[in-house]
Amino acid sequence: MHRLVASVIDTVVNLAKRRGFVYPSGEIYGGTRSAWDYGPLGVEFKENIKRQWWRSVVTGREDVVGLDSSIILPRQVWVASGHVEVFHDPLVESLITHKRYRADHLIEAYEAKHGHPPPNGLADIRDPDTGEPGRWTEPREFNMMLKTYLGPIETEEGLHYLRPETAQGIFVNFANVVTTARKKPPFGIGQIGKSFRNEITPGNFIFRTREFEQMEMEFFVEPSTAKEWHQYWIDTRLQWYVELGIDPQNLRLFEHPADKLSHYSDRTVDIEYKFGFAGNPWGELEGVANRTDFDLSTHSKHSGVDLSFYDQATDSRYIPYVIEPAAGLTRSFMAFLIDAYVEDEAPNAKGKMEKRAVLRLDPRLAPVKAAVLPLSRHADLSPKARDLAAELRRFWNIEFDDAGAIGRRYRRQDEIGTPFCVTVDFDSLEDNAVTVRRRDDMSQERIGMDAVADYLSARLKGC
């Protein structure tokens, strides 16, 4: 039975830490707030999400190509993009604890709890730490970009920024891609990479962090077709999450109000997931924005390079509009884990029913595709099982485990989402066959050892 998401989130966070999906960064030194490292299972899970996104958005289409641009970009790029001027958040400080918060986040949390804005503004908002009636400083603007200096001296000339989004690296390479890849609108450029934002209030596990990964694509279109393409990408990206196992009831679309649109956007629609956070359970997975011609126009103006496109078929020249589906990789990571978590019952070695925790991940996302398990640690069984695991490892990420009772080893694999367990038993020594157990229904099937690779291949398509 699937428990309510609100009660699942803490369980999944604990599972992620305990089983090696995610570790607090620098933990032996006390850690860094909202910074996380991805362990053996987490790094495989992340790579699988990226692989599915890349196949769906880039290599699975003839109208999209890939790019990997630099994390550090010149200051002029961010001046042109508007980030230096407008990439600010209103910051207030509690006069009780002297902690700083985004004013808009405090107000949004109040609205989510009470169903209306605070009548007297910040004066009605209690201190999040102490619960006392809040006493706040006046809001101040806080730039969220992280600075760095290149060269031996920290001067204005060497000032650069760590990118707060991957998009600008795509825009400044627009002309390069058009020329070398021989592309013309409608076409897109996709990119996966790290971005950095000096968030005032990071938190909610890996949902909001200062260092994060984005899966972004900029789709360049003739201006009159922008609205149609925008809706196409909203629908396409929403369906991607559903096809990879997210329950549609836990997804929704959120239309940004006109007064809260980013400086470049004509319309933005967020794909949100019901994470189960306190206050407001919904959180953004991905934003799909119509950025109009803002980006190419501003970079043309500031760089002096013509970034318009000449259409020979219509003998016309125009600045393409941009439709941007921008997904958070680590937010997707978190949503897929939460949505896959199920608790049911399974018999133990004595036949008694016990609680079983399962990650019912789509096999394409599962960090381990199959586990090879000798029935027991035995001089004849373990080597045979190891040889089979080595053969299968040529194709997939495979675990070998011969420690403990077979039932416990099944549970360990269920808990990390492994779709198949292959058991080598004493009969295997005679008939050269193994038992394949399915994760979700625990059904078992006996097949020849030399047929295991073909058996899994037929059931792990797209992995």
From Swiss-Prot:
Substrate binds at R102, E165, F212, E213, Q214, M215, E216, E324, P325, A326, A327, G328. Pfam families: HGTP_anticodon (PF03129), tRNA-synt_2b (PF00587). SUPFAM superfamilies: Class II aaRS ABD-related, Class II aaRS and biotin synthetases. Its main location: cytoplasm. PROSITE patterns: AA_TRNA_LIGASE_II (PS50862). InterPro entries: aa-tRNA-synt_IIb, aa-tRNA-synth_II, aa-tRNA-synth_II/BPL/LPL, Anticodon-bd, Anticodon-bd_dom_sf, Gly-tRNA_synthase/POLG2, Gly_tRNA_ligase_bac, GlyRS-like_core. Residues 113-134 are annotated as: Disordered. Its EC number is 6.1.1.14. ATP binds at residues 197-199, 207-212, 284-285, 328-331. It is found in: Cytoplasm. It comes from the Bacteria. It catalyses: tRNA(Gly) + glycine + ATP = glycyl-tRNA(Gly) + AMP + diphosphate. Gene3D superfamilies: Anticodon-binding domain, Bira Bifunctional Protein, Domain 2. GO terms for molecular function: ATP binding; glycine-tRNA ligase activity; protein dimerization activity. GO terms for cellular component: cytoplasm. Keywords: Aminoacyl-tRNA synthetase, ATP-binding, Cytoplasm, Ligase, Nucleotide-binding, Protein biosynthesis. Homodimer. Catalyzes the attachment of glycine to tRNA(Gly). Belongs to the class-II aminoacyl-tRNA synthetase family. This is Glycine--tRNA ligase.
